[in-house]
Amino acid sequence: MSSGLYLYGIFPDPIPETVTLQGLDSQLVYSQIIDGFTFLYSEAKQEKYLASRRNLISHEKVLEQAMHAGFRTLLPLRFGLVVKNWETVVTQLLQPYKAQLRELFQKLAGRREVSVKIFWDSKAELQAMMDSHQDLKQKRDQMEGKALSMEEVIHIGQLIESNLLSRKESIIQVFFDELKPLADEVIESDPMTEDMIYNAAFLIPWENESIFSQQVESIDHKFDERLRIRYNNFTAPYTFAQIS
């Protein structure tokens, strides 16, 4: 029994039936054209989908396969979007946001989103920082085994935090300075873990990805094995397809 329509994304061009895609619940994916917008959808077998790894991957895979098939300009829709009928899409999405959707298509045409996440070893960085600031290390060592006042504890903690922040910012600045000129737009997000120090998405010309990738690798070499970099060069443009 159908629970409605599960929506994956919106495209500016029709997608022929020869493009065969499989979505959530192993359902075939179809396209529906409304007022010049092509929606990829499948029959929803559930009213609400659990954001499990399997379901998230299935959702993303539909969009990525469409991109591989040559339909690179798209507006990905959030995971779990189920509507009862197309009238809901018209009244709640197209009528109020039609102009903004078309502006987003223009912005994304010929461009792709890539993301860079940078990780460091916080314990190793702390030790390296202390080794390079002998005065701070000596001050910390002198306090070991002593009964410290709250003010002393706060003071030494602030000094350590400030120096670690400076190390972190110097790394981030290198990446930003060398990658920003290659991008049309950059959106920085909060780090997701304690060891993640930078999390950013870049909107770049589609054909320039290899240049961007080489630059990321070049920066990585500058820091030797100090950092771990997670670079994603093929994803739907979730970060840059936001309706304001």
From Swiss-Prot:
One of its GO terms (biological process) is gas vesicle organization. InterPro entries: GvpL/GvpF (IPR009430). GO terms for cellular component: gas vesicle. Pfam families: GvpL_GvpF. Keywords: Gas vesicle. PANTHER family: PROTEIN GVPL 2. Belongs to the gas vesicle GvpF/GvpL family. This is Gas vesicle protein F. It comes from Nostoc sp. (strain PCC 7120 / SAG 25.82 / UTEX 2576). The gene is gvpF.
